[in-house]
Structure formats: C-alpha cells, structure tokens
Amino acid sequence: MAEAGTGFLEQLKSCIVWSWTYLWTLWFFIMLFLVYILRVPLKINDNLTTVSMFLNTLTPKFYVALTGTSSLISGLILIFEWWYFRKYGTSFIEQVSVSHLRPLLGGVDNSAPSAANAANGEADSSRQSVSECKVWRNPLNLFRGAEYNRYTWVTGREPLTYYDMNLSAQDHQTFFTCDTDHLRPADAIMQKAWRERNPQARISAAHEALELNECATAYILLAEEEATTIVEAEKLFKQALKAGEGCYRRSQQLQHHGAQYEAQHRRDTNVLVYIKRRLAMCARKLGRTREAVKMMRDLMKEFPLLSMFNIHENLLEALLELQAYADVQAVLAKYDDISLPKSATICYTAALLKARAVSDKFSPEAASRRGLSTAEMNAVEAIHRAVEFNPHVPKYLLEMKSLILPPEHILKRGDSEAIAYAFFHLQHWKRVEGALNLLHCTWEGTFRMIPYPLEKGHLFYPYPICTETADRELLPSFHEVSVYPKKELPFFILFTAGLCSFTAMLALLTHQFPELMGVFAKAFLSTLFAPLNFVMEKVESILPSSLWHQLTRI
C-alpha cells in the first residue's frame, strides 16, 4: 500500500514538473494573443508608425555607425574567446552557459540515477581518472650528471621540469629509505639528502655519508648526479654494487626477525635491483650490448616479482639493437598479455616485428590494386593497435616533430611516453627496410576507426582526457606538447568571427552605397514579416468581426 502511494506521488510530481516545463510555451502564445487583441487600446499601430517614421528620418551615417559598433563589439568578444580557448581549452560562453545558465533554466536530467548510484559512478570515474593519469618511472631514463647536465651546459636549457624532478625525489625516498635509517648515521644523512632540493647539497651529503661508511645509496647519488661521463657512472655503480650486496646478504638473514628487519630487507632489495639495472644500462650505452642483455636476463630471473622497474623494456631495446628478433618475439609473448599493463614499447615493438615481415616488399600502389595479403593485414592491424594506444609516436618516428631528451617520468598514452619511446627506438625502425614507409602509409587510418576517441575506443579504453595537462607538467616549456584529439574551435568563436565579419561588411557597404543598402534593408524586413502578416490576415478572416469588436472594447 505504501509502495502504491509512493508511486502515485512520484507520478504526480513528474506530471507537475512536465507541465511546468512546457507551461512557458502556452504563456508565450497567450501573451502574443493579448497583445494582438489590445493593439487598439495600447495604440500599438500608432507607436509602430512613429517608430517607422523615426527610422525613415535616420541618415546612412547612423547605420554605418551602428554596424561599425556591432563589428567592434563582436571583434572584442572574438579576441577574448580566442584567448580564453588558447589558455583553458574551452569556450568562455559555453562554460558560463553550461555551468550557470543551464541549472537556472531547468536543465536537469529527470532520468538521473539515485544518489547512491551517482556516488558509486563518481567514485568509479574518479578511480579510472586516477589510473589513467598515473605517472610512471621512465625505464630508459637518462643519467642527470652524464647526460641531462651536459645538455644544459651546451644549450643553456633545462631538460627536466621541477615537477618531474620532484617525482624522482619521491621515488628515491620510497626505494632507498626505510624506518630504521636513523639507527645508522650514513643512512640517516642520505635520508635527508634525498629530500634536499639543491643538487650540490645532495652531492655534499653523499660525500659526507661515504666518509662514515661504505653507503650504497651515496654511491648511487654520485653516479647519477656527479659523474659527468657514463664510464665514471659505471665505476661508481660498481662500488655501490659491492656495498649493496653486503647489506642485502645481511638483511636477508634477518628479514624474518620482525617488521623493521623485513622493511630494511625490502629497501636493500630495491637498492640492489636499481644498481644492477643501471649497470646494465651503462653497459648498453658503452656498446657492450650482449653483456647488458645477460645482466638484464639474470636480474629478471633473480627478482621476477619486481615488475615495477619494467626491466623487460630495457631488455627489448637491447635485443632490438642486437637484431635478435626471435628473442624479442619471445619477450613480447610473455609481456604482451591482456592482463598486463600495456606500453608504447610493447605495442610498437609488436608492430615493428609484424611490419618487418612485409615492409621490404610493401607498395601502396600494388596494395590498392590487388588488396592486402594476410601478412600485410596483420602488420596494418598491429600498427593501428599501436597508434590507438599512443597516437603521438608516429609523428616522432616519421620525424614530423623534433625530439627532445625524454623526461624521467612518463604518462602512458601521452606525449611524454611517445618522446621516451621514439628517442631510443627510432634507430630500430630505420634499420628495418620499409618499416617507416609502411607506418607512413597506414597510421592515419587508425583515426577513421575511432572517430570519437574520448568517448569510445576500439581495442583499448577511450583515450584519457588528462594527458595534455600532465604532459605539460612533465615536459619542458620549450617543447610544444602534442595534443590528441585535435581540439576543434568552439561554436561561439566561429559565430563571433562570422558576426564580426558580417557586420563589418555591412558597415562598409552602407558607407559606400547608402541608397542601395536602404532599399535592400526595406526589402529584407518586408520579406521577414510577410509570413506573420499572412497568418494574421488568415486569423482575421476566420474569426467573426463582432468578436474582434467585443474583445477590443474590453
């Protein structure tokens, strides 16, 4: 019974809401009807005659001034709209109308879900947004002292942003510190050093820690920031490895004695893995690629659970340098799995391997005549898959945009990830004959399959909206961030541009041909009001004249 009463009240409420929604239409027609009936008492005809006489006495200069002023005002609105769009990526008029005017006009969805469902939906969308905008450590990040600082010395530009370096400082504190560091003087000094913003202060603290003890993290800091060459960095990392292995063995024996010992062992494990990975990267940069591959494989076997370092991406790049494509395919078979997070390295390496099988004989003219073979179709689909995951990469691989030094952190599917991938893998694409030609001929076809990438994807989730904002914080200001999808001009910018141009043209024509424009304006107004006059004549002919006479006497 209660449910029936509640349902009746809901129906009654919806009927009232519906009636109020459309009541303004009825009110509008009633007002028009009353104005027409009371046109004689209100002397509307006399007033219209007076207004028309006033307009006839106006000179063409008035119309020139009127249209010129309208053009000026619409031009100012256009300039403001364009500035607001360039700065905030949206139209000011649209934002105000949606945020403030729509609620006042009753623009509320009556079919909205319940409050609980709405709260759950907001929570799900926020979790998805956080996941999409997660920033990852760049697996192939360069050395600050030996590479980033050398770039600054030569060009005078800072390749790293403060936001990027701050994220690295947080990573160092997470990987290289633990709660028991205050018990060891050298580790206590390094705990403060990782939080220090000044590079010279960090380096001085590392030297101070080494005076007290053979501290592995102090060697890491010096290898990353003080060493000016890769050779110097490798020497320091070897010293760090010697100290780190000793700490790792000691903490491994004590890890089951309590939570503090377990945390210390976890920290020592992170330190050891980081050192070995950087040593492998040093060997790769110094040309000892086979040695680097062996070190990476051993590291992945010894610590299979530490996938957060993404060592397999370092391994893929080194194997491509050796042109060991069978080994690359074996690594992809393990990591290009639907349950594992994707990356540009995985998607584009898979596309490169499939393109390699057909690219040397591929010809767009021949393909258009005979159609694509099965192998060519597989290669094109792999390229489309890679482009859907990260649409920024092809511009760098095809050298349509200039590369910069990759940041220390990347946003997956963003411009920062595209730079990091292309910086190291462009040479591998160039080495495969015809691969870049195949990419050039096919990559734009991806966008025809996903016309609305922000709303619906094809093989992946819709493209995240947050990439542009995050990439602007990760990449230096001198780099022009790649934006996808390309933003279209808002309607109101186009409208104000058209209005400004139209009124300016009217002002010019009125000034040059005043009589002709006057005739044109009268003809336009008479044509505009012709349907209304026709309707009123029909209404007067249908209704009896006595009724009109009685209504006008009210």
UniProtKB/Swiss-Prot annotation:
Query: Which UniProt keywords are given for this protein, alphabetically ordered?
Result: Membrane, Transmembrane, Transmembrane helix
Q: Where in the cell is it found?
A: Membrane
Q: Does the keyword S-adenosyl-L-methionine feature in the UniProt annotation?
A: no
Which stretches are transmembrane? 15-35, 62-82, 489-509, 516-536
Q: Which GO terms describe its cellular component?
A: membrane
Q: InterPro entries from the entry?
A: ST7
Which PANTHER family does the annotation name? Answer: SUPPRESSION OF TUMORIGENICITY 7, SUPPRESSOR OF TUMORIGENICITY 7 PROTEIN
- Family according to the record: Belongs to the ST7 family.
- A Pfam family of the record is ST7
- Name of the molecule in the record: Suppressor of tumorigenicity 7 protein homolog
The main place the protein resides is membrane
Membrane topology classification: Multi-pass membrane protein
